[in-house]
């Protein structure tokens, strides 16, 4: 039957100049085309009707190694017979990429005219997941899989699976309160407790009562599943754990300059020649910029035999994504290249590389808190929560010999850190939320079923 050239990543309104995950982030080989030799029986992709490419089968083997994969049958059965399903899993177990795909399979089989929407707390996470899932499903970004973030949309009427921020879905409810276009709604990172996600949790309970065929899937970190089950009338729970348990190494004392201590430790790890990428959790985005500059300056002073340090800044609140490095630089570098991912404590969803072996945690983070007395936001730098520290450790769940370096003593974890991060609805200015509830004809906060009262 000859040879078919299948071009699978067709970007519509997506602009590679503005949004581009570098090849060294996703571990791909950079091939733009897959060549498939046709035999007598070709397996067709049910989402676009085209034969699967050979890359699809390679990625399928990687997907089957994810910890979440063994729960697929249990999840599909729970989704078929329950309106709400809760999935509690460690970080990097694959729930954010695989669960929405399974929901799309459910809609294709049970509700063919309905789509799936999956919310993300961070804009870069929504775009990055859409790129990765479109690749795994062997479909075109902007057609069968798309994304919608503030001021940018890459979707079409044929889109079956859409990633978006929680604020985008909240605004969509203003025009269509019952969300009739969707058969399954997936709320990811519920444990982040953003204002938009909290509002969606309360409002979607009324939507579920009006639409018996609608399904709601909640993805959360392990520390919050009990709270969600109590809020959702004992909905079925699926629990997923990482493959490996990382070793935590604590500092003897609290560092007066945790930023400089983190950079010193980073260089020490690089000098050990142990393989693996490094994630550094810093206090604020200004520290990310400084660390990026200092690592690039120090690069010229390092022994070339150690290999190259590649800092990759990941900003949770910024609109741009990681720029693609020049291809000629990638090809010319033959020595070992170690990636250093720089982010803040809330940037954990942006870290999804598979080769992370070391994590450095400064133990503090900055967050914005609204002060009603002065009617202004204040930026506070405080110790992170115990649940957040555990999530930093879970990033190493796929590494058999991963280590978490905590730049604080172990007693600091139990004495100075709170058990959980407070809900944003209790610390943020709620003017926009009040206007949203008024638009939805809801009298006030008491009539919206929040997990935590504002």
Residue ranges and their predicted role:
Residues 1-454:
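P-loop NTPase motor module signature
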């Amino acid at each position: 039957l000859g040879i078919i050239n299948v071009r699978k990543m067709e970007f519509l309104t997506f602009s590679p100049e503005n949004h581009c995950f570098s090849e060294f982030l996703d571990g791909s080989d950079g091939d733009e085309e897959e060549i498939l030799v046709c035999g007598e029986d070709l397996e067709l992709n049910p989402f676009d009707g085209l034969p699967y490419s050979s890359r699809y089968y390679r990625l399928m083997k990687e997907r089957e190694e994810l910890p979440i994969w063994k729960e697929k049958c249990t999840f599909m059965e729970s989704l078929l017979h329950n309106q709400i399903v809760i999935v509690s899993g460690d970080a990097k177990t694959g729930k954010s990429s695989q669960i929405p795909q399974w929901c799309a399979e459910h809609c294709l089989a049970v509700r063919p005219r309905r789509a799936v929407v999956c919310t993300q707390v961070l804009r870069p996470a929504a775009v990055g997941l859409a790129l990765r899932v479109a690749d795994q499903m062997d479909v075109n970004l902007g057609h069968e899989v798309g994304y919608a973030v503030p001021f940018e949309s890459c979707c079409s009427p044929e889109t079956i699976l859409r990633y978006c921020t929680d604020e985008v879905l909240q605004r969509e409810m203003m025009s269509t309160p019952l969300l009739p276009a969707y058969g399954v709604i997936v709320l990811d990172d519920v444990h982040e407790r953003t204002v938009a996600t909290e509002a969606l949790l309360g409002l979607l309970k009324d939507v579920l009562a009006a639409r018996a065929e609608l399904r709601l899937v909640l993805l959360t970190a392990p520390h919050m599943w009990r709270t969600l089950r109590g809020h959702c009338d004992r909905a079925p729970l699926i629990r997923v754990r990482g493959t490996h348990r990382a070793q935590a190494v604590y500092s003897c004392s609290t560092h007066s300059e945790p930023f400089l201590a983190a950079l010193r430790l980073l260089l020490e790890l690089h000098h050990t020649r142990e393989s693996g990428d490094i994630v550094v959790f810093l206090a604020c985005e200004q520290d990310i910029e400084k660390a990026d500059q200092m690592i690039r300056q120090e690069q010229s002073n390092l022994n070339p035999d150690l290999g190259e340090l590649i800092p990759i800044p990941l900003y949770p609140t910024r609109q741009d994504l990681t720029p693609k490095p020049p291809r000629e630089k990638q090809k010319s570098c033959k020595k070992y290249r170690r990636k250093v991912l720089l982010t803040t404590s809330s940037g954990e969803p942006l870290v999804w590389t598979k080769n992370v072996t070391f994590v450095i945690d400064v133990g503090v983070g900055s967050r914005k808190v609204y002060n009603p007395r002065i009617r202004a936001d204040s930026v506070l730098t405080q110790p992170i929560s115990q649940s957040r520290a555990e999530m930093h450790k879970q990033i190493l769940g796929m590494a058999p010999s991963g280590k978490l370096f905590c730049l604080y003593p172990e007693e600091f974890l139990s004495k100075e850190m709170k058990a959980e991060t407070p809900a944003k609805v209790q610390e943020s200015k709620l003017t926009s939320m009040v206007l949203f509830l008024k638009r939805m004809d809801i009298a006030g906060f008491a009539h919206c079923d929040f997990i935590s009262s504002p």
